[in-house]
């Protein structure tokens, strides 16, 4: 995070050594850190082509130790899929009876666009059908929240716009909001999400919603997916306004994370 090690070197270190970690809580944390390093702190051109983390996670997901397998599978579902991980999740959907893992697999495949051999509106329709079927299998409160995330993860412009607008409207309860935000910003959504628009709606969101909902919404919609100097400049301009204290703190925190990502990408490029 502080730029003393290139992100790609950290990813390589975790990919080589994760299999040796025996403490599950530690393993879960370092896998999450490696995924963050690859998606946020590494040079995007390198990250797009590198598969060492995905390969290591896939190997761990195939472990005979059920607890370790779950940790690796959950991490694998949160990064960009490649051919082998795509096939793994397709098989998992066909064979697993674990509802939580099935939702992870389904969401990853939906976001990847590989749930069915269709694209565009047909892909969205296939996702809705698959989610409805899965919800019949897991008709629980947890299953319902997972279904909201999965549907929000459909990576089409129309879907992302609809989910964004629904979130900005401020009529969702906290749990539904969190699930839809997680799906909205799931892997593969970066180029489909607005950036500058956040700074036009943030003050309205803050003034119109309860403190808890407003904080969740502002934090979730801040355009951290657009790691660029332009977005950083927009954030600085926004922070120069006369803002409510809570809104200023929330945006400042996200602005600083964005600045860190910019610095670390520069370090990673060498």
Language model features: what each stretch is:
Residues 1-270:
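Long, ordered, helix-rich scaffold segments
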């Amino acid at each position: 995070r502080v730029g003393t090690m290139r992100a790609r070197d950290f990813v390589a270190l975790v990919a080589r050594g994760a299999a040796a970690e025996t403490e599950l809580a530690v393993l879960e944390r370092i896998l999450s850190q490696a995924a963050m390093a690859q998606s946020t702190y590494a040079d995007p051109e390198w990250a797009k082509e590198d598969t060492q983390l995905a390969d290591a996670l896939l190997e761990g997901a195939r472990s005979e130790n059920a607890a370790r397998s779950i940790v690796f599978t959950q991490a694998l579902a949160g990064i960009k899929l490649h051919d082998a991980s795509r096939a793994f999740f397709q098989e998992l959907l066909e064979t697993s009876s674990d509802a939580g893992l099935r939702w992870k697999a389904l969401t990853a495949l939906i976001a990847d666009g590989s749930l069915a051999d269709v694209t565009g509106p047909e892909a969205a329709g296939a996702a809705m059908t698959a989610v409805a079927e899965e919800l019949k299998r897991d008709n629980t409160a947890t299953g319902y929240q997972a279904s909201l995330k999965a549907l929000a993860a459909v990576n089409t412009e129309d879907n992302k716009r609809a989910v964004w607008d629904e979130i900005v409207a401020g009529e969702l309860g906290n749990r539904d909001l969190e699930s839809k935000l997680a799906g909205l910003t799931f892997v593969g959504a970066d180029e489909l999400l607005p950036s500058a628009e956040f700074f036009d709606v943030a003050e309205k969101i803050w003034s119109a919603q309860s403190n808890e909902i407003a904080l969740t919404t502002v934090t979730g919609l801040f355009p951290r997916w657009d790691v660029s100097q332009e977005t950083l400049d927009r954030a600085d301009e926004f922070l120069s306004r006369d803002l409510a204290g809570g809104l200023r703190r929330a945006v400042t925190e996200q602005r600083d994370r964005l600045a860190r990502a910019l610095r670390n990408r520069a370090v990673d490029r060498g």
